[in-house]
A protein has these predicted regions:
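Solvent-exposed loop/linker segments at secondary-structure transitions
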Residues: 1, 119, 152, 187-331
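Acidic, metal/ion-coordinating pockets
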Residues: 1-207, 247, 251-259, 270
């Protein structure tokens, strides 16, 4: 709710306080449209990378990259290269209006070129892809010859808990779960200017064991004050735990669809965006049921979209479902 009502601005000081070293725009960075994305990401202190988002010059003509394609860490004379790739299917999987003015291309279009730049021109000892493609697309990419020379794909988008790196033909692939529940930790052993070994682990962030940072907690509280009453306002109750952990069907999405069906009972099919993130809510209050706050509605549906109805054919529905299943599970 805080992000929606401030069009993302409230998140900037919080992210800067967290002290990230590098950013990659994901599929939802375009939610407030291109100009706002550039302004918001430009307000973040750390560098940004993305090698497959271009300015749209009109008539399908591709301009320059919006962000630098790569970033290099120099650690005691050893260069570690980071290449960025986001999901090229954004205009197809979300409303194309969000990403108007941006042209996306597949990573395979320039990956081999930039790997060559990092390995041979920049003399990087280790090359990683920071990715927001989703696990199946990342595995597909790691088996393509263009990925030769990439050591790891540090993946995102589908929020999978990959506890052991998946070794593909050319690269290893990992993903670190969702909503801050885990952190992926990659440790490199460097000797005589070369990386001689690596070790990856998925570190669980247990709120019962880790104390919240006082400074960041205060900053979040300060940003929430104007909207606190709305965020904490109870709008309903659930008799079952609400979560969104599974790949295909979840209690949260089922509840959302049931609500849509209740609102427009005359339609045959109801659809909702398959968000893959949302903190669970399972603790009953004094009523014995689980309270649903206004703020939690925005956790479940973090896009202030309009409910729309329309007419489609069975063939259109089948084609759309086949494309989605293929994009998510096959490619």
């Amino acid at each position: 709710e805080l992000s929606v009502k401030t069009t993302g601005k409230a998140m900037v000081p919080i992210l800067n306080a967290l002290g990230y070293d590098l950013y990659l725009p994901g599929n939802w960075e375009v939610i407030y449209y291109k100009k706002a994305m550039q302004t918001l990401l430009g307000s973040l202190n750390a560098p940004k990378v993305c090698a497959n988002m271009y300015h749209d010059l009109g008539d399908g003509k591709k301009g320059e990259l919006i962000f630098p394609p790569y970033y290099i860490w120099n650690i005691k004379g050893v260069k570690i290269g980071f290449l960025g790739y986001t999901d090229p299917l954004v205009p197809l999987r979300q409303s194309p209006e969000y990403s108007r003015g941006i042209i996306y291309k597949g990573p395979e279009e320039n990956l081999a070129y930039y790997v060559d730049v990092l390995r041979n021109q920049e003399q990087c000892a280790y090359v990683l892809i920071v990715s927001h493609l989703g696990l199946s697309q990342q595995l597909h990419l790691a088996n393509r010859e263009e990925c030769k020379g990439v050591d790891y794909i540090l993946g995102g988008d589908t929020h999978e808990r990959v506890r052991k790196p998946i070794q593909c033909k050319y690269s290893k692939v990992v993903e670190p779960g969702a909503f801050g529940s885990f952190v992926g930790k990659l440790s490199l052993t460097i000797q005589n200017g070369k990386v001689i070994s690596d070790n990856y682990e998925l570190v669980e962030l247990d709120a019962d064991k880790l104390k919240a940072d006082d400074e960041i907690s205060a900053l979040i509280k300060e940003n929430e004050i104007p909207f606190e009453a709305d965020i904490n306002s109870i709008v309903g109750y659930s008799t079952i735990p609400l979560y969104r952990y599974f790949v295909v069907e979840n209690p949260i999405d089922t509840m959302v669809l049931n609500a849509l069906k209740w609102k427009v009972p005359e339609v045959d099919i109801v659809l909702s965006n398959g968000f893959r993130f949302c903190p669970p809510r399972a603790t009953p209050d004094h009523t014995g049921n689980i309270p649903i706050t206004d703020g939690y509605l925005y956790d479940m549906l973090p896009v202030d979209s309009t409910l729309r109805t329309g007419t489609v054919t069975g063939a259109q529905i089948k084609e759309w479902l086949e494309k989605e299943l293929n994009n998510v599970f096959a490619k």
